[in-house]
Amino acid sequence: MDKERTGMLLLSKEDIKSVITMKDMIEADKQAFKMVVDGTVDTPLRTVINGKYDGAFLFMPAYAPELDAAAMKVINIFPHNIDNNLMTSPAQTMLIDGKTGYVIAMLDGTYVTQLRTGASSGAAFDLLGKKECKKGAMIGTGGQAAAQLEAMLAARKLEEVKIFDLNEERCKAFAEEMQKEQAKYGATIIPAKDSDDCIEDADLIITVTPSPKPVFFG
């Protein structure tokens, strides 16, 4: 086997963004969900190891014979990292050649998680949402919010998306940032006064919050 085949790529968030779009990821998620339903992939339950410092190590493997590939995401949950301005859920994704067992790539798992999770919502919007949509609504502006918003914009040609978060300053800052970052989609991103204002007349709604209580009433 030549050296090129046994080498390992290290792919950052910027590397991944340069080669795959949200629309690409939505289609990839659709394919992955179908493979799970068809039983053509092996996805064991994740392994969790609890550590010190209220931390936990999560290992999530999968094997797709028809793709000759296996993968494992390692995501570590350390809630106190925020006290040191560190990510609370750092992650890496390992891609393995199914023919040789060689690790062929290591990807920024945090971004892969954001992208894949957002695309899951995008797939639902694409398959289940109305074909003609003009207004979107999103509640929450946390780590998953940017990808969820882009998935909504990629799935439907929206004119406007309202954003709400309990932290008014963060909501405004997020809306301004997303207006610039997602300008290619042509939608106006607006901070909402409250959750009711956010969802009023919305064609698509997504919540990005761990709240155990309802964040709006239908």
PLM-predicted stretches and their roles:
Residues 1-114, 122, 132:
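N-terminal ligand-binding/catalytic initiation module
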Residues 128-135, 157:
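Short helix-loop-beta connector
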Residues 155-182:
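NAD(P)-binding Rossmann-fold cofactor-contacting core
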Residues 152:
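Aromatic pocket-lining residues of Rossmann-like dinucleotide-binding sites
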Residues 184-218:
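Rossmann-like adenosine-cofactor binding region
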Residues 137, 161-162, 190:
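A structural signal for isolated positions on well-ordered beta-strands in alpha/beta enzyme cores
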Residues 145-146:
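N-terminal Rossmann-fold NAD(P) dinucleotide-binding loop
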Residues 141-142:
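Glycine-rich Rossmann-fold phosphate-binding loop(s) that bind the pyrophosphate
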